[in-house]
Amino acid sequence: MACTTVNVGSCVWVEDPEVAWIDGEVIEVKGSDIKVKCTSGKTVAIKVSSAYPKDVEAPASGVDDMTRLAYLHEPGVLQNMKSRFDINEIYTYTGNILIAVNPFRRLPHLYNNHMMQQYKGAGFGELSPHPFAVADAAYRQMKNQGISQSILVSGESGAGKTETTKLLMQYLADMGGRAVSEGRTVEKKVLESNPVLEAFGNAKTVRNNNSSRFGKFVEIQFDQRGRISGAAIRTYLLERSRVCQVSDPERNYHCFYMLCAAPPEDIKKWKLADPRKFHYLNQSQCIELERMDDAKEYRETRKAMDVVGINSEEQEAIFQVVAAILHLGNVEFGKGKEADSSAPKDDTSNYHLKTAAELFMCDEQALEDSLCKRVIVTRGETITKCLDQESAALSRDALAKTVYSRLFDWIVNKINDSIGQDPDSEYLIGVLDIYGFESFKTNSFEQFCINLTNEKLQQHFNQHVFKMEQDEYNKEEIDWSYIEFVDNQEILDLIEKKAGGIISLLNEACMFPRATHETFAEKMYQTFKDHKHFSKPKLSRTDFTICHYAGDVTYQTEQFLEKNKDYVVAEHQTLLNASRCAFVASLFPLLAEDANKKSKFSSISSRFKQQLVTLLETLSTTEPHYIRCVKPNNLLKPLIFENQNVLQQLRCGGVMEAIRISCAGFPTRKKFEEFLERFSVLAPEVLDKSTDGWPLSSTDDVACKKLLEKVALQGYQIGKTKVFLRAGQMADLDARRNEVLGRAASRIQRKFRSYLSRKTFLMLRKVATNMQAVCRGQLSRLIFEGLRRDAAVLEIQRDIRMHLARKSYKELYFAAVSIQLGIRGMASRGRLRFQRQDKAAIMIQSHCRKFLAQLHYQRLKKAAITTQSAWRARLARKELRKLKMAAKETGVLEAAKSKLEKQVEELTWKLQLEKRMRTDMEESKTQENAKLRSALEEMQLQFKETKALHLQEVEAAKKMAETVPVLQEVPVVDTELVEKLTSENEKLKSLVSSLDQKIDETEKKFEERSKINEERLKQAIEAETTIVNLKTAVHELQEKILDVESENKILRQKSLIQASGHLPPTPVKGSQNGHFSSKESPFNGSEIETLARTQEQESDAKTRRYHLDRQRENIGALINCVVNNIGFNQGKPVAAFTIYKCLLHWKSFEAERTSVFDRLVQMIGSAIKDEGDNEHLAYWLSNTSTLLFMIQQSLKPGATPQQKTPVSTSLFGRMAMGFRSAPSSAETSAAAEAAAAAVIRPVVAKDPALLFKQQLTAYVEKIFGMIRDNLKNELQTLLSLCIQAPRTSTGRSLRSFRSSKTMRNNSPLDHWNGIYDGLNAILSTLQENFVPPVLIQNIFIQTFSFINVQLFNSLLLRRECCTFSNGEFVKSGLALLEEWCNETTEEYAGSSWDELKHIRQAVGFMVIHKKYRISYDDIAHDLCPILSVQQLYRICTLYWDDSYNTRSVSQDVIANMRVLMTEDSNNADSSAFLLDEDSSIPFSADDLSSSMKEKDFAEMKPAEELEENPAFSFLI
């Protein structure tokens, strides 16, 4: 895509021997020759065909996909990669190919879990390039299309292939992994196989500290659901020669150094020492590596072995074999006793030989013989041949290489067996980590095999790239012709052709015993002397050169024959097969063919060739994905980009070949809107225009076609969504566009100069007008000042005249008032004197009348007292007779009392029996009620009979009293005693009447309850309450009767003593009126007390059982009531208040054991199962938070309940105390007011209450999190659409951005309006359910923080979002959120607006004009103080102005940021530029309580449903 036509001032790329390509400006054009002034300062003269056009409008930070480059050529690709590498963007797409540049430093923010979550499900190319995107695309295609996939990772040593493979396997394991509960052993073993294989297959080379010395193909198998079901690891061509030969400054395999750094007990067990003392390790001066701890790696490797299924015994055996190889390498050989023989050189060699034999667990002498001798078997005899020193050393090295190779193969097979392969697997994803193309100063057999592999893969790669090009053209439905590409089949035939290929000749030479590398080279020279891809170097007799696709490579044939032979010495096979160690013996099994033939030749090249055929067959059945790893420099240091080195790797990796294939067709592809936006200035008249000048009716493809026809361009193609241009056509269009823009610039300059001149004229005219206005104003002010002075003089004169007249008037007024005052005072004093005289006369008359009236009253009072005394004496004597008759009634009442007690006990027992059997014996309940009713009627009849008997006895006593003559003159000896007896009798009568009344009430209640069968529980409770009251009344009556009886007895005795002097003794039987003496009494005091105590104990046991049953029923009723939405009262939840009042009344907080808390927790847990109903969740959040607040206030530390007064243990004592302590109505009302004023009172809580408080706190936090997460999920979909302005076509997008109206109903802000409405909806829901403001505030603060994180991270991950127009769009959306925060009170919004500080500052920076004038200090301290250097750097490098095409910040600012980032590169936290989401609970129970202290529950009303339940009467 060289330049065809250039003009002076055009920017081009020219070749440079130092930096490969350098840009410059054309300063002279002479035909086909041009002069270019380079940016380095030098001027070069070149042909036009040697220069390549430069895209001056390309973004400074490069593009994600190099197919989007305007000019797809080598310098453009190289510059794009270098620009991205400078801003730590190490990944770039070339179509579907990912190019990865090794940064040689840790970038943890690119590979954390958050980044992995970003790429899950994202479309390929939607986010920044990343290996996760390639792995996700492969996984999605596998699941959606049902086709197996493969990912090929290639690159030279040190390019980062192994690390990239780890990332791919990590992502695939996460995507296809099972849940933790199902066990994730397969994917864990796949991941942990990497450190094991690295320990035994990786080593330090000149180019890489952790170079893989083997090829690896990992097959990850998946089931139909896309879960990993198995895996297999295939390895290729382990570099066996490294075990014995190491060049400086390289190292041997890592496992040798790890073993030498093992714990002391392992070192002692295997007799190890410092690595410098072992021959296989001290050939190089490099023993230790920076940033690598061998001891730590040893421990990590052992752990990884445990995970992949290698048990501890097998691990011990593995490292025992590795230690044996080290000791074997220290065995040196000297001359033996016989000629041409060898033997261990000294005691040190004998020690290591003995140690190696002990570790191999074989015979020491047999090991020595296998190294120093060979047994030749002929037809008739067996000949033992001694080996010389050199041959013995080669035999030793051969044994070491064979043992290590067999050990490595065993580890790979063990890992495969442990992971397991799924025979029913539907699909697989293969990850190929293969060595890249190699060309060194000395290239041996390993480089030959490696380059053969790359030739095969390059052929597969070219075919895939060609297929992608065809798919792209077919997708866009354009006409295309066959595209030629370089086919390397001739090179492959040269190497691997069955008859006459290099591998065939090599195998043939290995079969001949006398063949050497000279004969092999001579055979190749003769066979391929005419082949165009094969040549012989001039200065060498045995070397040969092959022209590979990546360049010419010269191979040295000295060791080709030895390295191609793959056979085991018969003595070594026999020796180790007979080892006492089962593990060592299993490495060398004795095969049937080995028994027949002592040594069998097999070709490594043939086996490797067969492995490649199998690999390519597997790859051909899969959909390939390519990752090309690039090493930026050979120093292995960060921030260094060597152009020549990178360009060579791009050529070797086939990237340039892929670009060449693209250039052969249509290298430039632009979307319609991008093409019109860039080149619409060439032919604006071909577009249909509306009133505002933008396309209206014509579509973008028609506009593009008209534009290209207008400029007379040939060879282009119009697809469905893109314009396809031939090579060089983009440069031609750019040249024409620059001419149009130049003319437009001149026109703009002319208009601008005219504008400046007019502005100057208008300014001068305005200044003259202002000066005239100032002069006229000064003259007017002078005239106005004279007029104002005249008006002031007149005003002063008027005020003085008014003051004089007012002063004269006041003097006359005060004189008249003084005269009137004197006359009126004299008249008033005369009237006062007359009134005093009149009052004195009246006072004298009143005292006289008072004396006469008082005298008359005293006389009447004295007469009345005399009359009253006589009458009271008569009444006292009559009352005494009544008391005597009442004493006779005591015995009858006592009998009635005992009968009532029996009836009460029987009634109590029947009620309890009814309660137990009420669920399954409804008929029995009716019978029991009838029995109770009949019992009550019988008791009432008995009471009436007792009462009638009492009346008869009273009448009889009256008749007897009438027959006995009583002297009227007997005086009352003790008046106080009579009054006391009278009062006691009155109380007794009142108690009897109250008992009668209560019995009547009980009868009425039973009659009412019998009509309602559904309310059986309430009937039992009220009946039992009535019975308890009856028992109390009966006991009270019993005590009062005993007291009255004793007092009547004393009074009767006194009366009889007083009347004995006048009346004859009359014998009266004690049984006639029911009165007995103390000895004959049927119930004395002790018996009554014992009987009462027994009844009390039985009653208490029954009462406890009854209370437990009733409490369970009450809890069920409470839960059935509050589980429904019973609303709010005075802005507070009724359910929480009702629950708290019940818990407080039932004393559940002070109980050691109770089930009420468990049932409440279960009720709350089942109520919030519907996680998506925010209305329901808000209701329960309000209730749980309020209940938690009330419990928090009650269970405060240091709270002590009121001390209880001691309760008497005696039944009669408790009854008496109840009568004595019964509160008056005033006291009752005062207590009620105190209780209402203090609903929440402190209690001492036990463990169940404290546990319930913790569980309630957890539910508050859970419901809070559910509402918050529901809101986040609702906003998630809208946020993904709010980060980028809608863009359907060029005209439409430009119109929307140039529109001056930004009302809320505009279509670009629909998604922001959705967020606005969603916030209002959740706020109204929370307010309607009276959720505490502190919880609402925290919900919105965390939601705004979530919005900030999502928008800011999307801004940093997607370059198309970092534009000027998109910044304006996001800023308008943020204005809506600010409007919402302003409309919402601070009580609910809080600091929500401050949570958007990152996205606000980022968007504010994006919409600033003339960013190139802003310094770094202004950005970091004034504009964006909250953003880190990494975040600012990424925004500045990703930003591009799609509206005005202005520049971003200056290069000095970018350089300053880069220096600061380099200084912080070692800090993992500082290098992370993405924000993390905060999902913690931002409040505690104390915070909730402190915010709700002002709530008053004094006038709260409980649930209406419970008010009708008598058991909850305490709520009213």
Curated annotation (Swiss-Prot):
Which PROSITE patterns does the record associate with it?
Answer: DILUTE, IQ, MYOSIN_MOTOR, SH3_LIKE
Q: Does the keyword Repeat apply?
A: yes
Question: From the record, what ranges are coiled-coil?
Answer: 890-1056
* Region forming the signal peptide: none
Q: Which residues bind ATP?
A: 155-162, 208-216
Where does the Myosin N-terminal SH3-like domain start and stop, copy by copy? 7-56
According to the entry, every stretch annotated as the Myosin motor domain falls at 61-738
Residue ranges occupied by any Dilute domain in the UniProt entry:
1158-1463
GO terms in the biological process aspect are: actin filament organization; actin filament-based movement
Region Actin-binding, residue ranges: 494-528, 530-553, 588-612, 612-634
Which residue stretches does the UniProt record annotate as biased composition, category Polar residues? 1069-1084
Annotated region (Disordered) at: 1061-1085
SMART domains (UniProt xref): DIL, IQ, MYSc
Gene Ontology CC: myosin complex
Gene Ontology molecular function, alphabetical = actin binding; ATP binding; calmodulin binding; cytoskeletal motor activity
Which parts of the sequence belong to the IQ domain? 741-770, 764-793, 789-818, 812-841, 837-866, 860-889
Cysteines paired by S-S bonds:
none
Entry's free-text remark on domains:
IQ domain mediates interaction with calmodulin. The tail domain is a globular cargo-binding domain.
Q: What does this protein do?
A: Myosin heavy chain that is required for the cell cycle-regulated transport of various organelles and proteins for their segregation. Functions by binding with its tail domain to receptor proteins on organelles and exerting force with its N-terminal motor domain against actin filaments, thereby transporting its cargo along polarized actin cables.
Q: Which family does it belong to?
A: Belongs to the TRAFAC class myosin-kinesin ATPase superfamily. Myosin family. Plant myosin class XI subfamily.
Instruction: Describe its partners and assembly state.
Output: Homodimer.
Query: Mind telling me which PANTHER family this protein's record contains?
Result: MYOSIN, MYOSIN-14
- Which protein is depicted? Myosin-14
